[in-house]
Amino acid sequence: MFAERLLAVLSGRRPVHWMLGHTIGEAYEQLVQLAPRTPLRTRGALPVVRNCGGFHPRPGVVEAFASIAAGEQVRAMAFRLEQGADLRWRCAAVELGGDPVGATRARA
């Protein structure tokens, strides 16, 4: 699942260059900016893709989302996949939700 590939990079388990052949356009630069901060790395439980879904606005394009869970914390991740002339799907954009919600939010 593509969301798991993104999670591996954004949690620091894989280097950003692992996505070179799986991105197009600005998506790789977005990952280069995000990855060093490891925004999906957590202490304790490893983050996992809890659910994933998508919408097909037109053939060859998927606007996808995933919820990433680590213990009681949940983060949102959105990404756009585009199918190339070679029929391979590549990531064209990545976006992360705001602050983690869950246990830390419950204390507020």
At which residue positions do the language-model features occur?
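Core segments of small alpha/beta cavity-forming domains
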Residues: M1-R41
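Surface-exposed loop/turn and secondary-structure junction residues enriched for glycine/proline
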Residues: L31-L34, C52, D99
